């Protein structure tokens, strides 16, 4: 079976509080998977661990056969993440903001134009991010997540 995401006994503790407790997942390639639960259930913490933003207290995970922490940078290239309130460099254009992400991920220059096209912002790419409407900022955040067309979104 080909799994895109595998976690084994993934756990995150903060002092005396267990945020994520012993989560083991096997998510197949091509599937749609989401986390549901009340506030404080560990949904965001699990996502932060999978993005490599916080390390698990115990357990392990892999994404597309790449293991954390040794393959952390390769894992980042496999995941497009879209947060609720994305932030941008206000003094840069939409295109320049995406180019910052592109360079960090080591993606080809064409990936910026591809992402702008995907979200319908190609004609606004040279506008300063601070001049974008709320909806345009949301689309720019989505374009950032789609840069390089990652296999995991």
What is each model feature region?
Residues 3-7, 12-153:
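ABC transporter nucleotide-binding domains
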């Amino acid at each position: 079976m080909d799994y895109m995401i595998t976690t084994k006994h993934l756990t995150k503790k903060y002092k005396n509080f267990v945020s994520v407790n012993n989560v083991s997942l096997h998510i197949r390639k091509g599937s749609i998977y989401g986390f549901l639960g009340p506030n404080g259930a560990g949904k965001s913490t699990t996502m932060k661990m999978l993005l490599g933003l916080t390390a698990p207290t115990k357990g392990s995970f892999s994404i597309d056969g790449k293991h954390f922490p040794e393959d952390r940078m390769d894992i980042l290239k496999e995941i497009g993440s879209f947060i609720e309130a994305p932030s941008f460099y206000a003094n840069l254009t939409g295109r320049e903001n995406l180019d910052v992400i592109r360079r960090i991920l080591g993606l080809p220059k064409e990936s910026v134009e591809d992402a702008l096209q995907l979200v319908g912002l190609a004609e606004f790419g040279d506008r300063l991010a601070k001049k974008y409407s709320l909806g345009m900022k949301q689309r720019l955040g989505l374009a950032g997540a789609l840069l390089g067309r990652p296999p995991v979104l």
